[in-house]
Curated annotation (Swiss-Prot):
Molecular function terms, GO-annotated: zinc ion binding
Keyword Transferase recorded: no
Signal peptide: none
Expression sites by tissue: Ubiquitous. Expression is significantly reduced or lost in glioblastomas, glioblastoma cell lines, anaplastic astrocytomas, and astrocytomas.
Composition bias type Polar residues, residue spans: 144-168, 617-640
Keyword set, alphabetical order: Isopeptide bond, Metal-binding, Methylation, Phosphoprotein, Ubl conjugation, Zinc, Zinc-finger
Chain ranges of the TFIIS central domain: 927-1046
Protein's UniProt name: PHD finger protein 3
Record field: compositional bias (Low complexity): 473-483, 1781-1797
One GO term describing the cellular component: nucleus
SUPFAM superfamilies found in the cross-reference section: Elongation factor TFIIS domain 2, FYVE/PHD zinc finger
Biased composition (Basic and acidic residues): 460-472, 596-612, 642-670, 867-878, 889-900, 1084-1102, 1581-1598, 1666-1684, 1888-1902, 1912-2039
SMART domains xrefs: PHD, TFS2M
Length: 2039
């Protein structure tokens, strides 16, 4: 579109690409904006041109003008210089802007390939609609004819003539070329205005002009001359009747153009292949410019742009070309001058050939034309066109001959020409492409003329020009041969017709050959000038075909080859062009002004759609293709070309239009190249024009769509045929048959529809034409019909492209190629038609327009000439397809696409044989009619076969309505339209589908609904049923596969290979993503399917076959089929299965995951089916039949049911766009132990997920055993919340989706919200419930499916209640998780008794605790603590060793030594197995400490803590003794087993005793679970156990010493000692915890020992914090679930600590001394003891807290750790144990190690500062940070700062802890470990160590109690804290005493151990000893004994002997206290109530 071109001029180069694609749209908009009037176009063009003129200076710079090589001041912008600025600006610029856009773009793009691509794009998407192009072509032909007639006619006449010529050329294959040629001509027209003025002044004077042009802008003038010649030639061709006029104008125009062309070609050939290469470059550039110079003004700038591009591309070539250009310019001057005298000289050839060349050169040009024409038309078409051309000119016969020869050659060379022609076409770019490839300056010259005819003759003209260049008119045959040689050189594939040119092409391709070819090119230019002058009208006519083929061929090959060749050529040409154009611009601008007036009339008419409203269809198309030329000529072309030329030469216009179409597409394809050539040719061309050229080129790029659009987008001067209103900036469509334009609104076409029509090669045919076409179908002669058909094909293609506009430029390229093929035929057709008369041309123009808009319609109803032409067009396209296949094998795939398009058109014609048996392509009307008939026939047949009582008239009406709706829906008869029609046809015809057609006929399914029905809805019931069966089968297979997969361990492929996935977090994340996507996919599938089925159902509602839905594939009466009703499960599931399975598998990382995903999909599908079935029952509710049916009874039941439960969580559930409400979570199944901590305050629902995906995932989780699954029920708090609750429920239920929580805490791997309707079945994966379950009559519920990490949970448990949590989680938790929640809740009341019983019977306690409700747990915290200790003792023996690795693998991953040395409690193992440390830990607590830890252990802990404050002594005495005995036994066995793997047997017996009170967490890996349980269960044997533990402790002390050396290397030795002091079972727990805590605090040690369990638990940091912080926290908030309880507990503990501060201070003093002694060991001991004490009892925790506080003052490190731990406990107690555990373990322990957690806790920091040796990184402070900071369990505690302060204080402790936990600072050998241990657990551990000496004295009991304390502490905060609340407080008292004693000892030991810890081996040994001592001390003495033993051990911990001696001492003290503890513990066991009361 002209305006678009103008806009393109303004488009910056950086936006050129966008402009290319937006060009068509811009054109539409621009056309709308400027189509109102030519003046608007002209003004806008002028304005834009003025912008261009500024662009000459600035805009061009902005638009890559710097790229332009021609800065020649003489080179004037066609727009602004000689050529009428209005003319140039209006039309030349407009067209050129489009062409220049491409040109500029190509200028920007150094590769000619890009330019070719751009050209292709432009060719494919011409600015104007095919009609407009054809009209403009016709107009251009007419105008060219007029110009030719007037010869020296004014610019307007010249423009008209040129425009016409160009239009015809564009109509032909060369219309695109012509656009290029015109663009070049326009570019050269400025010089060529001088040229053409001269040329117009003298026919032979054109030679002068040409010399001038060749000198100043040889290429631009050549292109303009060529354009002029082409225009004239086309006019003469089109005006074969008026060859004289044509000859004259064409001579004049052609002389100027040909003079340039001849100069170019002559230079090319004269320069030989060298110049041919260079000049062809220039010539193609020139032609490129000519394309650009469709806008004559911009053509120069286009040339310049091309020149710049080419210059940029081949600056060296440009130099050569500039030399050559100079040569050419001189040669052209001489040649032009000589042309008159010398045929050899291009000048003489040009001058004489104006008429002489008509005879002589006519033959060579005919030969060239024939060659190219044959290449394009292939023999017959080429001959015909060239014959016509020859007839048109004196050389028509020679042309025919040459065409025959060339056609033969071309047939042969066409294949080569596909590439060579592409080269030639590239050089000629249409005509310019030929010039480019053939070194076809001739072609550029010819392009102006050949734009009309050159597209067929261009190649010939180029060849002729080459021949002429060599021989001029005298050696026309030789020049033809030369042209062939040049072609062969230029386009090697072109062997025969273009061997010479092929030679030129290769030479062009070869930079070295540029000059040679260039000399040939000069010769050729001269010859071509002659030839072009004489036969160029003929040549133009023929060349369009050839050029088109060449362009087509060229584009595939030449775009690659010529991109380089043309780059060189273009550069050479740009140099030549610039030089020549600059020279000729001055000279030629005057002649050019005239010739350009003619040309502008011809070209602009074509170029400017606004200028060519009447001709717009044809002319516009040609002008779009000629865009560059016509734009300058456009103004005159517009008026004259429209009216006169269009009217006078409709046939010519038609041919021209087809040539233009052909030309334009090839030109557009080649334009960028040719423009480059043109630009290269005229290096002097000011780069200022590049913006225009670029815009033009860009427009060219979009020219096909644009030109098609413009054809049918509209001509600005056109008015709507219906409303008679101007464009009005509205989308207009041009009739494919006539020039009438119609508003899209008026004819019911939208731009998109028009584009679709263009894509489908459909034309819009107005009502008049439709009627006329039917009449005219058979009028045209076979030749005319062929020609018309070809033209119609091309027009149709172009129209299709126009319609496609921006839809698919590739398609337009394909069409362009196809059009090029057909245009080759069109050229002949156009020639023939021109021979036949102009009337046919007009008709053809109209037809072309119509065809372009309605090719389909043409097929059915072409105008008589039209239809004949269409019929032949089909034949010709077939032929041309064959030809194209041969000639375009080298051509781009687009050629094949074009061929396919032809075939499609033919097929369409065949389909619509009614109107035309072989119509080239059926029009949209024809297609629609065919569809109507087909539908009617189908319905009538079905109606006849059926017994329906429906009148046949209704069937016809229905068919018509269906087609109407179909068309209105798709807005076009495009592929979608046809596909839908086929679908409808198939389903309506389907004999099995007896419902659809009945519904359709009955009106049950309206046509509007019918066309929107999905294939499934349309399908028959049988088909639908089959699909469902297949889907179901697929689902079943998937489920089966998943079941198999579930049986297999879940593996994950990593860089290490396949590894079993213990943690499903990554998988689940993937699955969640998958599932989330999958649900979406399922939804999408389900929705369409459901909608389809529902639609079917709606249709079948009349019969309402919904109940029979499964019996039919599709029934419109079936609501399900119609989509009105949710499809049954079977229906949706199969479909879902396919999608979901695919999706799931896609997302899955491994087969298991994929299977799981698929299964999940399947499950989702099944679930969806299930829900669908429910929906069928109650369609409204998807998941739950009722939104939330809550009957009063149900509510009562719910309230009654919930009254028995304690909510475990309260917070917000928020789904941003759905609902937000406050809710409480009640346990349903699984262990709710740490949910309070694990669940965020606000659960953010991040999305939806398919239920099946969730259940598949859950199955995998269950199979993995590493996670624990917990189910909670959310209950709204208020009625308002109930509303939101119901909304959220309905949201998910209606979508059959689950909610996915987006903000899970660390321990919660995944959380899903499950909408469970009151009537919904409980998902099978959830049952049987392991917990309270759900009431029988329930309301609509939102369940929370929580998947937690067992191991991490266990680690958390390990940290705080490592033993307890691990034990329950280890053995029972797996089975318990659901039961734990429910049972724990239920058995909360039973807890005390059960705990006693539990101690009595390990199994019973475990089960009872599992059953105990959390509420009871809260009540039974004290008792729970004891049973938990027992449980811990009972459970630890088994997987403790297993867990170390697992636990280590978790958050605080201990070193291998830790793993090996640290036994993992069973809980840790179970946690690792269950996969959720925190969960397992919670479960363990809930199970083991169910009453204590579960439900609200915090409340119990608080109460217990308070009670213990008062009863702390008693509890500590009784419970702690018993608990400690148990703990000691456990800890002894645990520590022994942990430290001494060899003590597994011994520990087993001991562990068995302690198992009763201790969890398996305390169980050392070495100790068998049975032995450990035996320690737990055998309370009476606890002393013996303590003894055995002492033995074990000795072993463990060795191991602990080793481990402590490892752990204590940083700071684990003291934790180990603490563990040792407490007992190894509990000590292991506490050791693990201490290690965890220490690891968290002093990560290395913790990692070594506690870390494994912590790894098994939540994480070692978590474990540490739980063990240290968690102990106090768990004592305070046994379960971290109630954060308040924890806080209260902390408060209570603090109070207890304060109350017991004295004793705590004593203990802390002892422990401080001990801790200071064992700087790290004592911290870890304190931590262990503290954690154990806290775990054992909240009172002990309080004592520990007090001790810690006391220790802080007494200890520098220990006290600090203690106080810090206390602070941490206080804080963490607020936070869930998990948080505390993580914080304390990972944060506090590590913090203690790293100081950051320690120091965050001010007390600890102070104490740390006070006791730097142990507290630089005090463990207790670390523990407290965990408590204080309450880092979410899932969040690892922050890394501790380097041991700056603390470590400096403990110089003995190496800063980097021996065991560096991930994310945690390594423990320091000395102070680090002390500090980390001191921070939290260390104080506890010291307290326990203090107790440990007591326990050692009372070995089994004290140790067991300590162990129990440790274990409860380790087990779970709630359970352990409850459990510890009594025994732990007793231990605290003992620890206080012990700490007082041991604080000094620990200080001493810590000091000495700091040195030893500096030695990692010693620290490891200390760890091992501590473990043994912890277990020993815990067993021996609850607090003090263990602490004493720890203190004793901590000193020996450094030396194993000392540790062993201390262990013995601790065992003695533990035995002493152990006996007391046993008494106490037995009392606690016997008196669980008292323990509870104490708690």
């Amino acid at each position: 579109m002209d305006i678009v071109d103008t806009f393109n001029h303004l488009i910056p180069t950086e936006h050129l690409d966008d402009a290319l694609f937006l060009g068509s749209n811009l054109e539409n908009e621009v056309c709308e904006d400027f189509s109102a009037s030519q003046n608007v176009l002209e003004d806008s063009l002028k304005n834009m041109l003025s912008d261009k003129d500024p662009m000459l200076g600035s805009a061009s710079n902005q638009f890559c003008l710097p790229v332009l090589d021609s800065n020649d001041p003489n080179f004037q912008m066609p727009c602004s210089t000689v050529v009428g600025l209005d003319d140039i600006m209006d039309e030349g610029v407009v067209k050129e802007s489009g062409n220049d856009t491409i040109d500029e773009e190509e200028l920007i793009l150094p590769n000619r390939n890009l330019r070719d691509k751009v050209e292709e794009n432009s060719v494919r998407s011409p600015r104007k609609s095919p009609r407009l192009m054809a009209q403009e072509q016709v107009r251009s032909l007419r105008q060219s004819t007029i110009a030719k007639r007037s010869n020296a006619a004014p610019l307007s006449n010249t423009k008209k003539a040129s425009g016409k010529t160009v239009s015809t050329a564009k109509a032909g294959v060369k219309q695109p070329e012509r656009s290029q040629v015109k663009e070049e001509v326009c570019m050269s027209l400025k010089p060529e205005y001088h040229k053409e003025n001269r040329r117009c002044s003298r026919n032979s004077g054109q030679i002068e002009v040409v010399p001038e042009v060749s000198v100043s802008s040889s290429h631009s003038s050549v292109s303009s001359c060529l354009e002029m010649k082409d225009e004239d030639g086309l006019d003469s061709k089109h005006k074969c009747n008026n060859p004289g006029e044509i000859d004259v104008p064409s001579h004049e125009l052609n002389c100027s153009l040909l003079s340039e062309t001849c100069v170019t070609i002559g230079e090319k050939k004269n320069e030989a292949l060298m110049e041919c290469k260079a000049k062809p470059v220039g010539s193609p550039l020139f032609k490129f410019s000519d394309k650009e110079e469709h806008e004559q003004n911009d053509s120069i700038s286009g040339k310049t742009g091309e020149t710049v591009v080419e210059e940029m591309i081949a600056t060296r070539k440009v130099e050569q070309d500039s030399k050559e250009t100079v040569k050419l310019s001189h040669e052209d001057d001489h040649i032009l001058e000589d042309a008159g005298s010398s045929d050899i000289s291009s000048d003489a050839a040009c001058t004489n050939p104006n008429k002489t060349e008509n005879s002589l050169v006519g033959l060579p040009s005919c030969v060239d034309e024939v060659t190219e024409c044959n290449l394009e038309l292939k023999d017959t078409m080429g001959i015909a066109d060239k014959t016509e051309n020859t007839l048109e000119r004196n050389k028509i016969e020679p042309l025919g001959y040459c065409e025959d020869a060339e056609s033969n050659r071309q047939l042969e060379s066409t294949e080569f020409n596909k590439s060579n022609l592409e080269v030639v076409d590239t050089s000629t770019f249409g005509p310019e492409s030929n010039i480019l490839e053939n070194a076809i300056c001739d072609v550029p010259d010819q392009n102006s003329k050949q734009l009309n005819a050159i597209e067929s003759t261009k190649i010939e003209s180029h060849e002729t020009a080459n021949l002429q260049d060599d021989r001029n008119s005298q050696s026309s045959s030789v020049s033809y041969l030369e042209s062939k040689s040049v072609k062969s050189k230029h386009t090697k594939p072109v062997i025969h017709s273009k061997q010479n040119m092929t030679t030129d092409a290769p030479k062009k391709i070869v930079a070295a050959k540029y000059e040679v070819i260039h000399s040939k090119t000069k010769v050729n230019v001269k010859s071509v000038k002659r030839n072009t002058d004489v036969p160029e009208s003929q040549q133009n006519f023929h060349r369009p075909v050839k050029v088109r083929k060449k362009q087509i061929d060229k584009e595939p090959k030449i775009q690659s080859c010529n991109s380089g060749v043309k780059s060189v050529k273009n550069q050479a040409h740009s140099v030549l062009k610039k030089t020549l154009q600059d020279q000729t611009l001055v000279q030629i601008f005057k002649p050019l002004t005239h010739s350009l007036s003619d040309k502008s009339h011809a070209h602009p008419g074509c170029l400017k759609e606004p200028h060519h409203p009447a001709q717009t269809g044809h002319v516009s198309h040609s002008s779009q293709k000629q865009c560059h030329k016509p734009q300058q000529q456009a103004p005159a072309m517009k008026t004259n070309s429209h009216v006169k030329e269009e009217l006078e030469h409709p046939g010519v216009e038609h041919f021209k239009e087809e040539d233009k179409l052909k030309l334009k597409k090839p030109e557009k394809n080649l334009q960028p190249r040719q423009r480059r050539s043109s630009k290269s040719f005229s290096l002097d061309e000011p780069p200022l024009f590049i913006p225009d050229n670029i815009a033009t080129i860009r427009r060219e790029g979009s020219d096909h769509s644009s030109s098609f659009e413009s054809k049918y987008m509209w001509t600005p001067s056109k008015q709507c045929g219906f409303c008679k209103k101007p464009h009005g900036n509205r989308f207009m469509v041009g009739c494919g048959r006539c020039d009438d334009w119609f508003h899209g609104d008026c004819v019911g076409l939208s731009l998109s529809q028009a584009q679709q029509m263009g894509e489908e090669d459909k034309e819009y045919v107005c009502v008049k034409c439709c009627a006329e076409e039917d009449k005219k179908t058979e009028i045209l002669d076979p030749d005319t019909l062929e020609n018309q058909a070809t033209v119609e094909f091309h027009s149709g293609d172009k129209t299709m492209e126009c319609e496609k506009l921006g839809l698919s430029k590739h398609t337009t390229n394909d069409r362009t190629k196809y059009i090029d093929d057909t245009v080759k035929h069109k050229v002949k057709i156009l020639k023939r038609e021109s021979g036949e008369g102009r009337n046919s041309s007009d008709c053809r123009d109209n037809e072309i327009k119509k065809w372009q808009l309605a090719p389909l319609r043409k097929m059915g109803q072409p105008v008589l000439p039209r239809r004949s032409s269409e019929e032949k067009s089909e034949k010709i396209p077939k032929e041309s397809t064959t030809v194209t296949c041969t000639g375009e094998k080298a051509s781009k795939p687009g050629t094949h696409e074009k061929q396919e398009m032809k075939k499609k058109k033919v097929e369409k014609g065949v389909l619509n044989v009614h109107p035309a048996a072989s119509a080239s392509k059926p029009s949209a009307d024809q297609i629609r009619q065919s569809v109507r008939h087909s539908l009617k026939d189908i319905l009538m047949k079905r109606l006849t076969d059926s017994n329906l009582k429906v009148p046949e008239e209704k069937a016809a009406k229905v068919a018509t309505k269906i087609e109407k709706e179909l068309f209105s829906f798709f807005r076009d008869t495009d592929a979608k339209y046809k596909n839908k029609y086929r679908s409808l046809m198939f389903n309506l015809k389907d004999p099995k589908n007896n419902i659809l057609f009945k519904k359709v006929l009955k009106g049950e399914v309206t046509p509007d609904h019918l066309i929107r029905m999905s294939p499934e809805e349309l399908a028959s019931k049988e088909l639908a049923a089959w699909r469902r069966r297949e889907n179901r089968h697929t689902i079943e297979m998937i489920e089966k596969e998943q079941r198999e997969v579930e049986r297999r361990p879940i593996t994950k492929i990593t860089h290490k290979g396949e590894i079993e996935i213990e943690s499903d977090a990554p998988m689940k994340e993937q699955e969640a993503a998958m599932e989330i996507q999958e649900p979406a996919a399922n939804k999408s599938l389900e929705k369409p399917e459901g909608s389809e089925k529902q639609k079917e159902e709606v249709d079948s509602m009349s019969k309402d076959t919904t109940s029979q839905h499964r019996q039919h594939l599709f029934d419109l009466n079936c609501k399900i089929c119609i989509g009105r009703m949710a499809p049954p499960v079977d229906d949706l599931s199969p479909k879902k299965v396919k999608v979901v399975v695919g999706v799931a598998r896609k997302h899955s990382d491994n087969e298991a995951e994929s299977i799981a995903d698929a299964l999940s999909s399947t499950s989702n599908i099944l679930a969806s089916e299930f829900f669908e079935e429910e929906k069928q029952e109650s369609p409204k509710s998807t998941f739950s039949p009722a939104p939330r049916p809550e009957m009063p009874g149900t509510v009562e039941v719910e309230s009654t049911f919930l009254a028995r439960l304690n909510f475990i969580w309260k917070g917000f559930i928020n789904m941003p766009s759905v609902a937000k409400f406050v809710t409480k979570a009640y346990p349903v199944s699984g262990s709710p132990e740490y949910l309070t901590e694990d669940l965020p305050d606000s659960i953010q629902v991040g999305g939806r997920i398919s239920p099946q995906t969730v259940w598949d995932y859950v199955e995998k989780i269950k199979a993995s055993g590493t996670k624990e699954i917990c189910v909670v029920r959310f209950t709204p708090v208020t009625e308002e919340d109930q509303i939101s609750y119901t909304l959220l429920f309905a949201y998910f239920s209606s979508r059959k989706r689950y909610g996915v929580a987006a903000n899970n805490m660390k321990q919660v791997k995944d959380m899903y919200l499950i909408p469970l309707g009151a009537t919904d079945k409980i998902p099978h994966p959830l049952v049987p419930f392991d917990g309270p379950g759900l009431e029988l009559h329930r309301p609509n519920l939102l369940l929370g499916l929580i998947i937690r990490q067992k191991l991490k949970r266990q680690h958390s448990a390990c940290a705080s209640t490592s033993h307890i949590a691990e034990t329950p989680e280890s053995a029972p938790p797996i089975a318990l998780p659901p039961d734990k929640k429910s049972k724990i809740e239920v058995s909360t009341e039973e807890a005390p008794e059960e705990e006693n019983d539990f101690f009595n019977s390990f199994t019973t306690v475990l089960h009872k605790q599992r059953n105990k409700p959390q509420q009871n747990l809260q009540e039974d915290l004290p008792t729970a603590v004891e049973p938990l200790m027992e449980v811990t003792k009972q459970e630890p023996p088994k997987p403790l060793r297993f867990l170390p690795g697992v636990l280590i693998g978790w958050e605080n991953q201990p070193t291998t030594l830790e793993l090996a040395n640290k036994p993992l409690p069973v809980d840790d193992i179970l946690q690792s197995l269950l996969g959720t440390t925190g969960q397992v830990y919670d479960q363990a607590q809930s199970v083991m400490e169910q009453n204590t830890v579960k439900e609200i252990p915090f409340l119990n802990e608080q109460t217990n803590s308070k009670i213990e404050k008062t009863d702390n002594v008693e509890v500590t005495d009784g419970e702690n003794k018993e608990i400690k005995v148990k703990v000691d036994n456990i800890s002894e066995s645990t520590d022994k087993s942990a430290e001494i793997e060899t003590s597994v047997v011994g520990s087993s017996s001991i562990s068995a005793g302690s198992l009763t009170s201790l969890s398996l967490r305390g169980k050392p890996p070495d100790v068998s679970t049975e032995a450990f349980l035996t320690n737990l269960s055998i309370q009476s044997k606890q002393e013996e156990t303590v003894e055995s533990k002492e033995k074990t402790l000795k072993r463990q002390l060795q191991e602990d010493q080793e481990n402590n050396l490892q752990d204590n290397q940083t700071s684990n030795s003291s934790p180990c000692r603490s563990n040792v002091g407490k007992g190894n079972i509990d000590g292991n727990v506490s050791c693990s915890e201490n290690l965890v805590a220490n690891t968290a605090r002093s990560p290395q040690f913790i990692n070594l020992k506690r870390d494994p369990r912590q790894a098994a638990g939540r994480s070692q940091p978590v474990t540490t914090s739980e063990s240290k912080d968690g102990d106090s926290c768990r004592n305070g908030e046994k379960h971290m679930l109630p954060g308040l309880s924890h806080n209260k507990e902390h408060l209570t503990e603090q109070i207890n600590v304060e109350e017991k501060l004295c004793s705590a201070e004593k203990n802390s003093c002892v422990q401080q001394s001990d801790n200071l002694k064992v700087a790290q060991n004592s911290p870890s001991v304190e931590n262990i003891q503290t954690s154990q004490a806290e775990q054992a009892k909240p009172l002990q925790e309080d004592i520990l807290m007090q001790n810690i506080e006391t220790v802080h003052p007494f200890r520098r490190g220990s006290a600090v750790a203690t106080s810090h731990f206390e602070v941490g406990n206080t804080c963490p107690s607020e936070f869930p144990s998990k948080s505390i555990t993580f914080t304390s373990r990972s944060t506090s322990p590590r913090t203690s190690t790293n100081f950051s957690p320690m120091r965050p806790q001010q007390p600890n920091l102070q104490h740390l500062k006070s006791s730097p040796p142990g507290f630089p990184f005090p463990g207790p402070p670390n523990f407290p940070p965990q408590s204080m900071f309450g880092f979410p369990p899932h969040l690892p505690p922050p890394l501790l700062p380097p041991p700056g302060f603390g470590f400096a204080q403990n110089p003995m402790v190496p800063w980097p802890p021996v065991v560096h936990l991930p994310g945690q600072p390594q423990r320091m050998m000395g102070p680090l470990s002390q500090a980390s241990r001191y921070i939290g657990p260390q104080n506890f551990y010291q307290v326990k160590d203090i107790r440990r000496p007591e326990r050692r004295h009372s070995d089994p009991w004290g140790r067991q109690d300590q162990q129990q304390l440790d274990r409860p502490f380790n087990r779970g905060k709630g359970d352990r804290q409850r459990f510890y609340s009594d025994s732990h407080h007793l231990k605290r008292e003992r620890h206080e005493k012990e700490w007082e004693q041991e604080s000094e000892r620990h200080r001493r030991r810590d000091r000495s151990q700091d040195k030893d810890r500096d030695r990692k081996s010693r620290e490891e040994g200390h760890k091992d000893k501590e473990r043994a001592r912890l277990s020993h001390g815990d067993r021996g003495t609850d607090g003090k004994a263990s602490r004493d033993s720890r203190n004793v051990d901590k000193k020996p911990d450094k030396p194993k002997s000392e540790d062993y001696e201390k262990d013995k001492e601790r065992e003695k003290s533990k035995h002493r206290e152990g006996e007391k503890d046993r008494d106490r513990y037995h009392k606690d066991r016997d008196h669980t109530d008292r323990t509870k009361s104490k708690r």
